[in-house]
From Swiss-Prot:
Top-rank lineage group of the source organism: Bacteria
Disulfide bonds: none
GO molecular function, one term: structural molecule activity
Record protein name field: Flagellin FlaB3
Similarity remark: Belongs to the bacterial flagellin family.
Subunit description: The flagellum consists of an outer layer composed of repeating units of FlaA around a core that contains several antigenically related polypeptides. Interacts with FliW; a synthetic peptide of FlaB1 (residues 229-247) partially blocks binding of this protein to FliW.
Record gene name: flaB3
Compartments where located: Periplasmic flagellum; Periplasm
Keywords for the protein's UniProt record, in alphabetical order: Bacterial flagellum, Periplasm
Amino acid sequence: MIINHNMSAMFAQRQGGINGLAIAKNIEKLSSGYRINRAGDDASGLAVSEKMRSQIRGLNQAGQNIQNGISFIQATEGYLAETTEIVQRLRELAIQAANGIYSAEDRMQIQVEVSQLVDEVDRIASQAQFNGMNLLTGRFSRESALGPMQLHVGANMDQNEKIFINTMTASALGFFSDEGTDGSRSISIATVDGANKVIGTLDSALKEINKQRADLGAYQNRFETAYQGIAIAAENLQAAESRIRDADLAQQMVDYTKNQILEQSTMAMLAQANTQPQAVLRLMQ
């Protein structure tokens, strides 16, 4: 019988350390909800999980970018809707003035409203803003040095889309003319022929505005579809990442209970192993 080295006690002590470490890991996983808390838990799994997390966060931000872009489009379209109403009213006045029953004084009164409405078109264009950026003054036109509005709609590099918005000032729409008799540069309805020409000018302006609004509607529909696709992609990727990284709490609870029982059993056996050398004393008596 050996008394200098109690091999049974040493084995029980080593096994107790293993069981204690296993219990600590079980507690860590149960409290965090993650199967992988550090690279040592699963090195390859951690690498894949972190790559997926990067994509998920990128997709979520891209979704937010798209929603902000849709708000940008809706704001622009709202301003253009106001401009459309004004141009429609201008066209009514031009058709009214093109009727020969009105005197020069009557036309002058109509011209006052026309000039005010043209100024309002310019005011809308100059004050239409989103986050401090002018929308209708050509900042986002194809000819602009600043370039179009660019939305980043994906989780990776170069996944962006461009929004073009033409200039919608009164001048760009053709509402200024040198033919005015009242000293202004507004479109003039001072004569029947002048009013008739103005109708054509307004028709061209309406065509330009309607085309821009249609383009904005197409942009919005496209981005809404893109948002749904990104949301689905993020959801599926999150599910895949969860299967890699998240802990199966039921399984972890089973393991925790097993390791606790093993730990208690090991401590009991360690106590028994420590009593074995005492048998030598009985032999010496």
